[in-house]
Amino acid sequence: MSDRDIEAANILEARGITKVFGGLVAVNSVDFNIPERSIVSLIGPNGAGKTTFFNMVSGLYEVSSGSFRFLGQDVTRFGAHRRAQMGIGRTFQNIRLFGTMSALDNVLAGMHTRLKGSIVGAIFASPGTRREEREARWRAAELLDFAGIQGREVFAKNLSYGDQRRLEIARALASEPKLLLLDEPTAGMNPQETARLTELIGRLREERGIAVLLIEHEMRVVMSISDRVTVLDHGEKISEGEPAEVRQDPKVIEAYLGTARTG
């Protein structure tokens, strides 16, 4: 395989990514690839730089130095909205749903980067706008079904915690991402909810061809679902490889996995 073929197989390439806050180096010269149709997990202790790296991938933070290429294009200076339009979606550690909107309307809200109707068309309810709205509602319902959400008209705040987490993923899918960033999606879940969400993440790859970058502290989830795992410590990459390789890395066993290595 040529270098060009290798590059073409990566949906995201990060080179020398560094982020400095004042005198604190939060992420230090990290190289990182995400292959197409893969699940890559980013692990490390609190303060390792994982969420900072996420925020730079999504465009919420500017890099201090280094570069990102997405789908072969340099996106280093693109903001979050532009990257979302190109196909980078994300969820956050804390649930950010519209609590007094229905599950369906929450997903519709996630389609704002894809809808083409104009304000004038919306005011006068043009045929094109009505057709786009029907199609959007059908697609939102399909995404709720895919995520396993039954109560389409239920307020988001009244859904179970597990359903709220899956609703966040459904809303992120509404923007038609090619790469989806999931920041601790199983946090606070019981084992049954975790199993359902883990299965959903796997289906993103298998059924929709979406690449996933995952921050996750539950090592059983990381080791069971990831194609590759990268470990950060104090903002630096200390290990990278297939789950079985990372699992056997003495630095990782000592610093991050601990007793979870047997899980």
Describe the role of every protein-language-model region:
Residues 2-263:
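Glycine-rich phosphate-binding loops of nucleotide-dependent enzymes
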